[in-house]
């Protein structure tokens, strides 16, 4: 993987080189000390991935991300103290087209963790679709809200799972779901603990007819609300005395992530049974494959994003190969498919 390092600190550029030195499959093709240099070298060096700081002179990282994604799109990983969990800069970078972020840290333990995260993300990045990232930025919010005709009896639930590339993909799906949706929507986006998921929920809420919020422990579940799992917790649903509530669980990661799609899927099955419509959008690994297979086997509907419109095809591919998916659709058709399948279930078809 041809990698370009962008950071205004010579020490940090050297530190990143050191982090990647033990990985022979990762080749450093150059470095830059500001965003302007990054834009120029992204054009001339044709890297497979760019590691980008945020706070730099001449041109900051966010401006550089926007410029690169408009001129010579390439997967970008933000790597900065300003992109710690929950940071507004991290969300803005992802909105502008960056594919993921990893936070710098000062402690030895966290430095080792950041090194592993960075190497893993670079190695998986080759399966991303940089032209799609540019396309998503150009097409955001242009699709109309999809309307349905509901005659519902019973409880229904919608599950959406995503990881790397998820924030931009979610912005293609959630804002196109109608405000009168007769089911709650549970979103599991892989993110570490912190305020990031809350910031993402607030942005989606601004863009959507539906109310979008970060889930709170023990809150009552209501149709027409999108619940985003907070980072660092598994999100489950439980029904007692005819009331469904969210239970946030602080336990061990599943598939090395928390929240995990599979955990939410299994808990939803106990509450909603076959009355589930579930969609997996993008991400590395295989989280969601097991839970979606269980949902499908129980009579629920499952949807995966197509490879040609998926940022990272790992999670959808794993679910497809596990026999867990009913239909594969382009990202821009997933809102219609969710509404169509929920409408069919509500109307007893």
Curated annotation (Swiss-Prot):
Instruction: Cite the entry's keywords alphabetically.
Output: Chemotaxis, Cytoplasm, Hydrolase, Phosphoprotein
HAMAP family the record matches: CheB_chemtxs
Q: Which GO terms describe its molecular function?
A: phosphorelay response regulator activity; protein-glutamate methylesterase activity; protein-glutamine glutaminase activity
Which InterPro entries did the record assign?
Answer: CheB-like (IPR008248), CheB_C (IPR035909), CheY-like_superfamily (IPR011006), Sig_transdc_resp-reg_Me-estase (IPR000673), Sig_transdc_resp-reg_receiver (IPR001789)
How is this protein annotated for GO cellular component?
Answer: cytoplasm
Its Enzyme Commission number(s) read: 3.1.1.61, 3.5.1.44
| PTM text | Phosphorylated by CheA. Phosphorylation of the N-terminal regulatory domain activates the methylesterase activity.
Give the domain section of the comments.
Contains a C-terminal catalytic domain, and an N-terminal region which modulates catalytic activity.
Species the sequence originates in: Methanosarcina acetivorans (strain ATCC 35395 / DSM 2834 / JCM 12185 / C2A)
NCBIfam families in the cross-refs: PRK00742.1
Output this protein's name.
Protein-glutamate methylesterase/protein-glutamine glutaminase 1
Q: Which CDD domains does this entry report, sorted A to Z?
A: CheB_Rec, REC_CheB-like
Which Gene3D superfamilies does this chain map to?
3.40.50.2300, Methylesterase CheB, C-terminal domain
The record's family statement is: Belongs to the CheB family.
Record field: catalytic activity:
[protein]-L-glutamate 5-O-methyl ester + H2O = L-glutamyl-[protein] + methanol + H(+); L-glutaminyl-[protein] + H2O = L-glutamyl-[protein] + NH4(+)
């Amino acid at each position: 993987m041809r990698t370009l390092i962008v950071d205004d600190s010579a020490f940090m550029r050297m530190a990143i080189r050191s982090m990647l030195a033990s990985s022979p499959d990762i080749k450093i093709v150059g470095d830059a000390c500001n965003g302007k240099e990054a834009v120029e070298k992204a054009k001339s060096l044709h890297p497979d991935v760019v590691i980008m700081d945020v706070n730099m002179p001449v041109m900051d990282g966010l401006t550089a991300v926007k410029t690169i994604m408009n001129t010579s799109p390439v997967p970008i990983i933000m790597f900065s103290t300003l992109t710690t969990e929950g940071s507004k800069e991290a969300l803005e970078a992802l909105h502008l087209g960056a594919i993921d972020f990893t936070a710098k840290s000062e402690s030895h333990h966290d430095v080792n963790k950041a090194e592993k995260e960075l190497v893993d993300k670079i190695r998986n990045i080759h399966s991303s679709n940089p032209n799609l990232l540019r396309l998503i930025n150009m097409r955001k919010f242009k699709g109309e809200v999809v309307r349905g005709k509901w005659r519902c009896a019973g409880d229904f639930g919608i599950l959406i799972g995503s990881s790397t590339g998820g924030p931009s993909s979610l912005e293609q799906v959630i804002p196109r779901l109608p405000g009168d949706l007769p089911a709650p929507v549970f979103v599991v986006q892989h993110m570490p603990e912190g305020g990031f998921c809350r910031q993402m929920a607030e942005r989606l809420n601004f863009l959507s007819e539906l109310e979008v919020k970060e889930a709170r422990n023990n809150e009552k579940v209501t149709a027409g609300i999108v619940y985003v799992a907070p980072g660092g917790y598994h999100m489950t649903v439980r029904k007692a005395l005819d009331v469904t509530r969210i239970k946030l669980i602080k336990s061990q990661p599943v598939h090395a992530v928390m929240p995990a799609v599979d955990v939410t899927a299994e808990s939803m099955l106990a509450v909603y049974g076959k009355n589930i419509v579930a969609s997996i959008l993008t991400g590395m690994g295989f989280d969601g494959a097991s839970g979606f297979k269980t949902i499908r086997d129980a009579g629920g509907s499952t949807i995966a994003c197509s490879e040609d419109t998926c940022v990272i095809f790992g999670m959808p591919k794993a679910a497809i190969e596990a026999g867990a998916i009913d239909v594969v659709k382009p990202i821009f058709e997933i809102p219609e498919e969710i509404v169509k399948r929920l409408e069919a279930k509500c109307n007893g078809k």
